[in-house]
Regions:
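P-loop NTP-binding catalytic core
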Residues: 145-259
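Hydrophobic anchor at the beta1->P-loop junction of P-loop NTPases
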Residues: 262-264
């Protein structure tokens, strides 16, 4: 019997400094505590700010055990039922199934190894695989993958456009992930219908392609995340999205029920 898994999917949102000098950027904060963290820093060699996802490192033996458990879980878990549960219920369910399979497969694991493997089971079954930690990052607005062998890019609220250390290297694996995105959006994608756009349960918008007939580097996807709480006028002013005068003008238009057209 392993000790209880504690996973914080909504860690405290940190205050990030806005630095004019990009070479001074070096911040780290939790995404899925205590397993996944983001490290944003200036790379002197590449002369750019990078977004590095830090996750638990698995030994070769741990990778083999993870693959065995994942293969067995896919045969017995109904994913449609699983994703309808609460986060707490899903964590408990994955935990019980993992312990059952470890026992049936006669595997031995230390407590630390089990925690790391459990994180990847949760990430890959309940979450959105490699990009699940990015979905948990409050500061990320857009996630973009332009095919295999190219880094996933993100748009950050504070540090804007950045390259990540996430790279899909296998066409079939990326195609499978795009299928998963479509399923989570309640849509269908295939060779006959290789384009889709839809919404994830959290409201995030997804656009994706499926085959090399559509895009040269294989399947692609873009996710535009939305905040659960809409921006307030003071926040829009603080972010310099709008000036006080612009908001005052909108206020007058709305108050007198004028017609408004917003593009972009």
């Amino acid at each position: 019997m392993q000790e209880e898994i504690i996973m914080d999917l909504k860690p405290t949102i940190p205050h990030l400094p806005r630095l004019e000098d990009k070479s001074k950027i070096d911040v780290r904060y939790a995404l899925i505590s205590p397993f996944a963290y983001s490290h944003i820093y200036w790379d002197d060699k590449k002369k750019e700010v990078l977004y590095e996802l830090e996750e638990p490192l698995l030994s070769e033996r741990e990778k083999q055990i993870l693959n065995k458990i994942e293969s067995s879980m896919r045969e017995i878990i109904n994913m449609n039922v699983l994703v309808e549960k609460t986060i707490e219920a899903m964590i408990e369910y994955i935990d019980k199934m993992a312990e059952l399979l470890i026992s049936e497969l006669n595997l031995t694991l230390s407590g630390e190894s089990y925690k790391k493997i459990f994180y990847y089971l949760f990430r890959n079954f309940v979450g959105l695989n490699e990009i699940e930690p990015l979905m948990s990052d409050y500061f990320i607005e857009d996630i973009e993958c332009n095919g295999i062998d190219t880094p996933v890019y993100i748009i950050h609220r504070i540090y804007r456009n950045m390259k990540t250390n996430i790279v899909f290297k296998d066409v079939d694996k990326l195609a499978s992930f795009v299928e998963k995105l479509a399923q989570r959006c309640g849509r269908y994608i295939s060779y006959a219908s290789p384009l889709f756009d839809g919404s994830l349960p959290d409201g995030s918008r997804v656009n994706a392609t499926y085959t090399t007939d559509v895009t040269t580097h294989g399947p692609t996807f873009t996710i535009r995340k939305f905040t659960k709480t809409p921006w307030t006028p003071p926040q829009l002013i603080a972010f310099r999205t709008l000036s006080p005068e612009m908001l005052a003008y909108f206020w007058i238009l709305i108050q007198y029920k004028a017609n408004i057209l917003i593009t972009g």
